Amino acid sequence: MSKELLTRWENIETLGNNQSVYFYAWGGDAQINAYIQWAAQQVKTKYNINLVHVKLSDTSEAVSRVLAEKSAHNNDQGSVDLVWINGANFATMSEHALLLKQWANKLPHFAYTDPANNPAVNFDFGIPTNGMEAPWGQASLTFYYDSLAINEQTNNKLPTTLNELLNWSTQNPGRFSYPKPPDFLGMSFLKYALVILHQQSSENIKAQLNQAATANNTAQVLTPLWNFLNKLHPTLWRGGTHFMQSGAQMRRLVDDTELSIAFTFSAPEVPAAVKRYDLPKSIRSYAMADGSLSNTHFVAIPYNASHPQSAQLVANFLLSPEAQAQKQKAHIWGDKSVLIQSRLTPEQQALFKTAKPHPSALPFNSIKRTLSEPHPSWVNAIMQGWQTRYGVSQ
């Protein structure tokens, strides 16, 4: 760290101690909530910071609050000090100048992410972060299945590509489905399909996925998706005439043996559900061979945060090897670390060594190919097109 950055950080440590930080973050998962409480205990000990988890049902609630404060000219006493964010919500906050700039790239622990060679920490759904977000974790679309129903003995081969999934669902009607948009998981499956369907497209068409959806490019980009869904839907649960509302409902249908294959964007959710008896012991996790839709999630500081220095101390702690290793443990959260192991000391690397994983957990290094998220604007384009074509019967 340069002398200038060191002096800057010393000032932040001085100003950031002995304050409260209001951390607006989704509160729908008990494991994640418990991890945030652990982090709160650590920053209390290190900096006498009182980290308050303001639980959200949707991150857009925090976005709306900061936007309202800006409209009311509250430019320095905001209620949100730190927010868990990525994708469309980051795009909205960036577009409306609601975020503090050029701080995340100056955190001491940011260097552990190898930013010069790691686009995942410099871009969020294709949009440059410009130091407005500190990376916190990574997630990938993970599939899981009932190994009693799908195995060599039953002559039922596990589908490992999108095309194989279509063929499998055709041969096993009613055993697969996905939550309907705008559910996050349902949208993730549709984005995975869209990216895969364009793997053989021209570079110009593929480039459109990283750019804003427009009236001119929407039909051309989305037509392959509608053609695919027209083939897939008749093979789905309830003949594709009805879709579940959420990932939790999809998981219950697997537990009830109505579905044989499902998916999640939180791989640790699978072994956790098996341990809670919400899924059978025969469940196994795997990654699609043609690629796994993946993204990085971040923490950001609103431009009008009341305690921006304290929020930076918290964000830097969340990036520490200690905090990232704790977060990656399957029984804690199981969220993949954003740190690059080669940038760590042997002692720091040792923190990440774990015991034998649960049989239903995603095997280590299963994900061989990651797929980047399309531009956030494609979410609305897909959602509107899906509703027009398939939403009437819902």
Short names for language-model regions:
Residues K3-T7, R252, P359-Q394:
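Conserved C-terminal helix/tail region of periplasmic/extracytoplasmic solute-binding proteins
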Residues W26-W38, V54-E61, D76, V80, ...:
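Extracytoplasmic ligand-binding site segments that recognize negatively charged/polar headgroups
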Residues N74-W84, L259-S266:
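Paired acidic/hydrophobic, glycine-rich loop segments that form the ligand-binding mouth/hinge
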Residues V66-N75:
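Short, well-structured alpha-helical segments in soluble
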Residues W237-A300, N304:
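Extracytoplasmic/periplasmic substrate-binding proteins
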Residues S292, H297-S366:
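Mature extracytoplasmic/periplasmic domains
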Residues R8-N17, Y24, D29-N50, F143:
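Short, polar/charged alpha-helical segment
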Residues E13, F90, S94, N163-L166, ...:
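Non-transmembrane alpha-helical segments in soluble domains
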